UniProtKB/Swiss-Prot annotation:
Belongs to the peptidase M20A family. DapE subfamily. It holds the Pfam family M20_dimer. Gene3D superfamilies: 1.10.150.900, 3.30.70.360, Zn peptidases (3.40.630.10). It catalyses: N-succinyl-(2S,6S)-2,6-diaminopimelate + H2O = (2S,6S)-2,6-diaminopimelate + succinate. It comes from Pseudomonas entomophila (strain L48). PROSITE patterns: ARGE_DAPE_CPG2_2 (PS00759). GO terms for biological process: diaminopimelate biosynthetic process; L-arginine biosynthetic process; lysine biosynthetic process via diaminopimelate. This is Succinyl-diaminopimelate desuccinylase. The gene is dapE. Zn(2+) 2 binds at residues 107, 142, 356.
Amino acid sequence: MTAPAELSPTLQLACDLIRRPSVTPVDADCQTQMMNRLGAVGFQLEPMRFEDVDNFWATHGTQDGPVLCFAGHTDVVPTGPVQQWQHEPFEALIDADGMLCGRGAADMKGSLASMVVASERFVQDYPNHRGKVAFLITSDEEGPAHHGTKAVVELLKARNERLDWCIVGEPSSTTLLGDVVKNGRRGSLGAKLTVRGKQGHVAYPHLARNPIHLAAPALAELAAEHWDEGNAFFPPTSFQISNLNSGTGATNVVPGDLTALFNFRFSTESTVEGLQERVAAILDKHQLEWSIDWALSGLPFLTEPGELLDAVSSSIKAVTGRETQPSTSGGTSDGRFIATMGTQVVELGPVNATIHQVDERILASDLDLLTEIYYQTLVRLLA
């Protein structure tokens, strides 16, 4: 373990945040620590608590000029079985291999520390910078995400706040820091389908209507359907059935209904309405008695090459020597809410190989490099 006095400012703050067990939606005073640091260098602070979720909005600078926002979350997922960890999950230990170990090291307290330290340095080096540096931080990203970034964005919209560029600190890198940035995400549309039949005795199938038999051809057609071709930025839309339930548990009873849970991860080539209409047409084609409940988690968004992506890519190249690869793969993030403000959004953070796993860890030295990347991006856009 590296002695605390030997740690960089970024690593000291990262360790402090990791040691706070902020399992979603609990913040465990992580945001207080961040706000104290930002307030000390002149940021205007606005805590925003919605229901049981802590959020804050912080700004430095003037309304004139563009706004660059750092966004992220202080909440982490549960640890899982603590006895399976090599070290205590909230110990924030740097091991003999130079790995910073602990829940949230990658997702995403390391990024938060880098954002704060980079911003402290930037506003001290450029006190009269153009535009604004902003922070949008929540403790509700790993949970339902109803009262976090989504709620803050709704408030900012109501106040006609401007947000030109946003860097989300999600762990975007795959093998080496900065090798991948996310410049968009697919949309996520979930559904619970209920197909009704008629319960009966398996020995008298003519007196029953088996919903499993009825639904199987329709589900097979949905699974085989080619929804779109994708485009230069997105792969084709995917359809996956995640749960299928029917039956009473008895071997001699034809069930009365079937439920299926499925999800679309969809590109900008498809729309919510279009997907819903095509699903309905296939179900009707098979003459099913059905009902469906839809749940939209987020629309697809895309940041095409431009000022933000150029600044981030150039900063990664200057600090690491690497050419970054923009990607829209993976799950959803809070970037989907921020993008609704017309904001260019890029996700850039540590290597994601161990996120949500036992023994989550990242290379400790990567956080100092990430701080420099964030700092250089600030300089390129707002100095």
